[in-house]
Amino acid sequence: MKRECRFEQLDWEGLIPALKTNKVDVILASMNDTPERRESIAFTDPYYSNPGLFVRAAGSKVEPTAEGVKGKVVGVLRASIFDNYVTAKFPDADIQRFTSQEDANAAAVAGRVDLLFADKIVMDGFLQHDEGKNFEAVGETDDPEYFGAGIAIGVRKEDNALREDLNAALKAIKENGAYKKVNDKYFKYDISGGTTQ
């Protein structure tokens, strides 16, 4: 695309408002393209797929089911699809909402959260570091009602030309092999979810 970019780090819940008020031009933050979000913004074609992964302390008996989390503390990123999912699926859980995944992870390490739920890539990273050494993955989901069409770049609805340019750039890196090269360098599995075809 040959465009100069400047990155802004924002709290998750401030991303869509920042886009809609022209503080940023795109959201490139592993945001799922969901019907709810499409009510206020547009998305590029998906560029990867990332299911949600449940993580618990090793040896814990907590299960990611409505009955399994009854009365238990589930930690999620506030205003995320993971928050929406556990709010709908686990009505009897004590849902703790955090402004960052790092805060949620720290609460689990401190024993204040029984079950974490976040995207698989983030949780895999947590499990591979010292802070996650006493934790284990206990299940994943990619329920399309909550996870939508995949991870895409968010743009304002009226920015059709920018969306088309971004789609062309995504298509080019998939066709020229750059996407696969990055995938293979950083991930142990194919994150494309079929988006590289």
Regions from the PLM with identified roles:
Residues 2-4, 10, 20-29, 73, ...:
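Alpha-to-beta junction loops
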Residues 1-9, 87-99, 112:
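A local structural motif
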Residues 48-56, 128-167, 187-197:
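Periplasmic-binding protein-like
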Residues 83-98, 134-137, 168-197:
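Ligand-binding clefts/hinges and TM-proximal coupling segments of bilobed small-molecule sensing domains
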Residues 14, 31-39, 85-88, 114-147, ...:
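A ligand-binding cleft/hinge motif common to bilobed small-molecule-binding domains
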